[in-house]
From Swiss-Prot:
The protein's name: Histidine--tRNA ligase
GO CC, one annotated term: cytoplasm
Enzyme class at the top of the EC tree: ligase
Gene3D superfamilies linked: Anticodon-binding domain, Bira Bifunctional Protein, Domain 2
Amino acid sequence: MNNLKNLRGTVDLFPDQLIKWQNVERILLEQLSRASIKEIRTPILEMTELFIRGIGEGTDVVSKEMYTFLDRGERSCTLRPEGTASVARALIQNGISSNPLQKLWYMGPMFRYERPQAGRQRQFHQLGVEFIGHDSVRSDVEIIALAWDILSKLGIKELNLEINTLGDTNDRSNFQKSFLKWLQANKDSLDLDSQNRISKNPLRILDSKNIQTKKVLENAPRLSNFLSEKSHSRYLELKRQLEVLNIPYVENFNLVRGLDYYTHTAFEITSGALGSQATVCGGGRYDDLIKQMGGPNTPAIGFAIGLERLILLAGKELEIPRNTDIYIINKGLIAESFAMDLSRKLRNYDLLVELDLSGASFSKQFKKANKLKSKSIIVIGDDEAVNGEFIIRLFGQSGNGNKEEVISFENDIKLENWINNNLLLK
């Protein structure tokens, strides 16, 4: 029988790998909390119709990449490929009109059937931030600045911000008519994939990575020439406010993002350290999405960050585990019982405590404590347990003033003083 293996494009993460993940997630949550952004959790599994209506039937995500199946009730279900549509659905279903202004974040696994490579998996993890009900340029700038600051805080190098405006629905409609006419006239000069997009999702051709097509597109109509005065003024104000905040940017007039729901501001943050998979964060405004899905007219803007790519880029210092504060060495039936009780008591001090359960010799337990670089150790043998006491010392030191103490199991005050003087004040 063949050995069971994980599916291609999924990975197992073990404790030593998760140190960096947990440190990255901790920093993310700290930054979001400081910005007064609240968490929302939505199901991983949704009705397929949600993504067809929300993302767009002609997008690559919906047409090629979704994990979709019929459940036992013959309903078409999909593992979520992104989070914005689910957030919009949740807000509509639960009465967005009662709280129209919200700043929300979510984090969790998403699923897309793509070719796996470094920083890209079929099950991947994403942080998303959504500002709901906010329509001012200031909210665009705030969310871009938040994404920029989060990535900077994580020590990501060679950051570049690319921005564009997609205008409103009328702007885009007028541009698309002209662009389609141009595409038909230049169809034979495009790569095959772009030719296939003409009838399905022509705007995505602007984002083509094909060298030949990119050269041809240099002569294509520009969306910026079809902007209304209002849309143009909004874009100018976006750039002005970014400059006030000293956030450097580059205009990319072909930046359209991969989903149909974007309007006005679109942006990506890339890192030169990532090579071909340079995009770390992408987002934009989606003022029509909630209304399009059956809710009230609600402006919104958001971004998403792929955690796998963050892990590749984040600083090495985030791989360093927190050292064990106290390692409890114990040997003997009576000692084991006391050690178990003591470990529970010590964790109330917000200490990282490891209780040795191996039953190995004292010397082997000392070696394990040394390997873990434990700051201190407690030693309990049956002799100490019978006397109702234990030895606590800073690891590697013995008989050095208050660095080592013999403490009664009942003397909580003496134990607390030792911890305060030797661990918590360090």
